[in-house]
């Protein structure tokens, strides 16, 4: 078979399965290429700071219902996400706001409990500084909003991780290995199925 839109025959599929040595070799070559790209053009470092957020449902709604809990959690979480990305908070990070909002910072929050503040940078120390500053600025701003009555008074925040932060590459090596191996094998399938041997 050498036409792209022609369905493969049983013989073509058998030929693919018989070439197991080629698949193993192709996977190794693809993974090696992925590793080479990773080390030649490494992704940025990522640091993670954590702020523990407790909405205290029991105190906010002594006779609560699930619907009240959900609405309260969704409303207050949305307000706090807006705070995290606000100009006042980002201005304290000593970096261009456009750059920070353009992918250098990422927020992962499960509504209640640990809110994770991620910062990416080529310099691992700078990534740590950004993540730590962002988490602390958020906690201070949120506390000020609680005291001003703009957030529920029962919300409690605590910066639990802002020093000696874990730093790792923003994209793990395993992703590069998998992408390299998969890409090489897909190319190999195309070659074996659609290029007729002489």
Language-model features: locations:
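Hydrophobic and amphipathic membrane-targeting/association helices
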Residues: 1-198
